[in-house]
Regions:
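Active-site metal-binding motif and surrounding structural segment of the metallo-beta-lactamase
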Residues: 29-74
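Active-site neighborhood of phospho(di)ester-bond hydrolases with catalytic His/Asp-centered motifs
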Residues: 22-25, 45-53, 73-76, 132-135, ...
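Alpha-helix C-terminal capping/helix-to-coil transition sites in glycosyltransferase folds
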Residues: 44, 102, 149-150
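Metallo-beta-lactamase
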Residues: 75-128
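Active-site metal-binding loops of divalent metal-dependent hydrolases
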Residues: 2-3, 24-26, 53, 112-115, ...
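Cap/insert and terminal regions of metallo-dependent hydrolase folds
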Residues: 142-163
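Conserved beta-strand hairpin/beta-sheet module of binuclear metal-dependent hydrolase folds
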Residues: 1-38, 120-136
Length: 163
């Protein structure tokens, strides 16, 4: 976890051969500093995945994508609502409910409760092991619980209050 909270979110996931960043909600310089502090290299990222359009999740996406030639995966609705994303090196779309691969990782995006256009949580699977990530989770709906069942690791940020 590189950052979590209303000032910025960024979660690094790697299996040793494929590395992804879920959200880049800090400046590109700050994310690069946090990578350096943790002995990581942003140029080794295979993808940046965007959960939703709020600035604390997308602030550094465009800069990192352009600087290190990193593909960005985002839903179409989130892209349309993202006013401060900037230009992207390689834009790829996903849809909640439809799994997709990044190299040897299988990602399952699913809808979550949050005050955004098309907010997504994710499970990431490899060789039968599954982890789950859901940020700004308002309500753990039955669908969310179903997706997060049997995760070996679960990362939840539940600071969104729908009321």
């Amino acid at each position: 976890m590189l950052a979590s909270g209303s000032k910025g979110n960024a979660t690094y996931v790697s299996d040793g051969s494929t590395s992804i960043l879920i959200d880049a909600g800090l400046s590109g310089i700050e994310i690069q500093r946090r990578f350096d502090t943790n002995g990581l290299c942003p140029e080794d990222l295979d993808a940046i995945i965007v959960s939703h359009e709020h600035s604390d999740h997308i602030q550094g996406v465009g800069v990192l994508s352009r600087r290190f030639n990193i593909p960005v995966y985002i839903s179409r609705k989130t892209k349309e609502a993202s006013q401060h994303l900037g230009s992207i090196y390689d834009l790829r779309y996903f849809e909640c409910g439809t799994a997709f691969n990044i190299n040897n990782l299988l990602l399952h995006p699913f809808s979550i409760s949050h005050d955004a256009v098309d907010p997504a949580g994710f499970t990431i699977e490899k060789s039968g092991t599954k982890i789950g990530i859901a940020t700004d989770l308002g309500i753990a709906t039955l669908m969310v619980k179903e997706h997060l069942k049997e995760c070996a690791l679960l990362i939840l940020e539940a600071n969104h209050d729908p009321d």
